[in-house]
Amino acid sequence: MLRREARLRREYLYRKAREEAERTAQERKDKVRRALEENRLIPTELRREALALQGSLEFDDAGGEGVTNHVDDEYRWAGVEDPKVMITTSRDPSSRLKMFAKELKLVFPGAQRMNRGRHEVGALVRACKANGVTDLLVVHEHRGTPVGLIVSHLPFGPTAYFTLCNVVMRHDIPDLGTASEAKPHLIMHGFSSRLGKRVSDILRYLFPVPKDDSRRVITFANQDDYISFRHHVYKKTNHRNVELTEVGPRFELKLYMIRLGTLEQEATADVEWRWHPYTNTAHKRVFLSAE
């Protein structure tokens, strides 16, 4: 079983590496094509291979390129089968972290919560794979305040690491009543860059396909690389107006890393993207939107 998993993982990484090489080659061809069409100078770094690239352009067509990619491998059952989400915490969780994990369980339809106990990460991931879990969520804390969220897609990855801030739990708001467990409609706003679409896919595939008459709405709104999570239900007051009611919890997410492996492969998996906060231009740059 372990050898089979290792082989499947190697095959997936090989496909991913080939796709990345093909994408880079296609970008170089596109730069040469645009320079020729617009009668501009060819970029300096491409001048040595410009003739070879121009020759290969003759054989390019719309064809089937780009129809499938590694995202299709990772989320091939998205929309066909409902995701199976497992939520757990770091070791020795405080009462507030347990409370937050319970509230996250209400956010994701069909999710299950598992007490961490003294289980190691490798044992957790193996148990999740054996039981058909598609996503493992781990919540971390600092002195009773939730500060981190890890989303690991199974069986091959990716794994996204987020910082949590400005957390307001349902338990902190009086007289909220019971939360709806209907399959929610999703609003994804501000994810216009390539990395933004990647993060949008990681988050939206945690939810099943909603029914048309669902009154529940979950929003992930990106602004300056901070993703605001909001949870509402709505009702129609008349044929023109809709009344929104926030049911919580609410928090902000800040992405700081995406790894290509699962959670237990932290030491060996390749890093797809990492935030570098200590560079001179870090405070000026945004990554999740193209604006």
Curated annotation (Swiss-Prot):
<keyword id="KW-0687">Ribonucleoprotein</keyword>
<comment type="function">
    <text>Component of the 60-80S U3 small nucleolar ribonucleoprotein (U3 snoRNP). Required for the early cleavages during pre-18S ribosomal RNA processing. Part of the small subunit (SSU) processome, first precursor of the small eukaryotic ribosomal subunit. During the assembly of the SSU processome in the nucleolus, many ribosome biogenesis factors, an RNA chaperone and ribosomal proteins associate with the nascent pre-rRNA and work in concert to generate RNA folding, modifications, rearrangements and cleavage as well as targeted degradation of pre-ribosomal RNA by the RNA exosome.</text>
</comment>
<dbReference type="InterPro" id="IPR007109">
    <property type="entry name" value="Brix"/>
</dbReference>
<dbReference type="GO" id="GO:0042134">
    <property type="term" value="F:rRNA primary transcript binding"/>
</dbReference>
<keyword id="KW-0690">Ribosome biogenesis</keyword>
<keyword id="KW-0539">Nucleus</keyword>
<dbReference type="InterPro" id="IPR044281">
    <property type="entry name" value="IMP4/RPF1"/>
</dbReference>
<dbReference type="Pfam" id="PF04427">
    <property type="entry name" value="Brix"/>
</dbReference>
<dbReference type="GO" id="GO:0032040">
    <property type="term" value="C:small-subunit processome"/>
</dbReference>
<feature type="domain" description="Brix">
    <location>
        <begin position="83"/>
        <end position="264"/>
    </location>
</feature>
<dbReference type="GO" id="GO:0005730">
    <property type="term" value="C:nucleolus"/>
</dbReference>
<keyword id="KW-0698">rRNA processing</keyword>
<dbReference type="GO" id="GO:0042274">
    <property type="term" value="P:ribosomal small subunit biogenesis"/>
</dbReference>
<dbReference type="GO" id="GO:0006364">
    <property type="term" value="P:rRNA processing"/>
</dbReference>
<comment type="subunit">
    <text>Part of the small subunit (SSU) processome, composed of more than 70 proteins and the RNA chaperone small nucleolar RNA (snoRNA) U3. Component of a heterotrimeric complex containing IMP3, IMP4 and MPHOSPH10. Interacts with MPHOSPH10.</text>
</comment>
<protein>
    <recommendedName>
        <fullName>U3 small nucleolar ribonucleoprotein protein IMP4</fullName>
    </recommendedName>
</protein>
<dbReference type="GO" id="GO:0030515">
    <property type="term" value="F:snoRNA binding"/>
</dbReference>
<dbReference type="GO" id="GO:0034457">
    <property type="term" value="C:Mpp10 complex"/>
</dbReference>
